[in-house]
Amino acid sequence: MATSKLTIRRSTLTDLPRLLEVTARARAFMAETGNPTQWRDGYPTEAVLREDIALGRGYVCQTEEGRVVGSFCFALGEDPTYREITGTWLSEEPYGVIHRLASSGEVGGIARSVFGWCFEQIPNIRVDTHADNRVMQSLLTHLGFVVCGTIIAGDGYPRIAYQRLFRGG
């Protein structure tokens, strides 16, 4: 897998066809790596991606050539999903949340670029993932995130909740 200098920008409706391709590839990758249930029933749907765009929380990663190779949702402020946790958050200070991180698999470094960019926006990040998503769990641990407990996602299923307070380095 090649690496490329990536740019992060807000997604637009013109990105939608490519966003659907990228998320389909990410769904397939999750199934191939033992996580066939986290993004079930075509999630994230076109409607979810459109809502992210409309609310200004949808982002893409693109190569120097302008090809979209990744996408994610990033929002600042309270996420209703994180109000109740079986466990304890590291901090109740204002935070950002990352959802729906997806890679086309064409270039490396998508997740590292996304998390780095998000920490430039706010030094307190929360994220959650499915118990079967070993790839994301490993990545989050490698990036210094701490397991804080379990939350119930919007689909009614439990997720492992992580948080990291960025202090530089």
Region locations from a protein language model:
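Conserved acyl-donor/pantetheine-binding loop and adjacent beta-alpha core of acyl/acetyltransferases
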Residues: 73-106
